[in-house]
């Protein structure tokens, strides 16, 4: 299937429902820069989602950026306070519009307007 960027593959980012992987190129360029700067693995858990699959997920945002190819949920091993800070700071500096952070996961998206962040 190949790579979308040096660190992220089509297989990792494809919709589990239909196999489509229509990720936005500029968004993926920024995701790769984020990975390069932080210097530790960001493992995609969810990337592109077709609208059908996205609407089937409980808790998925109505205006989710996943069907636009502008969102990724990552699993991050050993997500320490220092790593959380580095991820959040770098994502904001790179211009990601939405940033969510959980105990073991990290979300970035390409929404427009004022940046937002949340914990989950």
Model-identified regions with their sequence ranges:
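Extracytoplasmic cell-surface/polysaccharide-interacting catalytic and binding patches
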Residues: 1-37, 112-120
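Extended, low-complexity, intrinsically disordered C-terminal regulatory tails
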Residues: 28-59
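Catalytic cores and adjacent binding grooves of peptidoglycan-active enzymes
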Residues: 62-63, 67-68, 72, 76-120
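Surface-exposed loop/turn and secondary-structure junction residues enriched for glycine/proline
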Residues: 11-16, 51, 56, 60, ...
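Glycine-rich, flexible loop/turn motifs
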Residues: 4, 53, 63
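Generic detector of short, locally flexible boundary/turn motifs and exposed helical patches
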Residues: 8-11, 38-42, 71-76
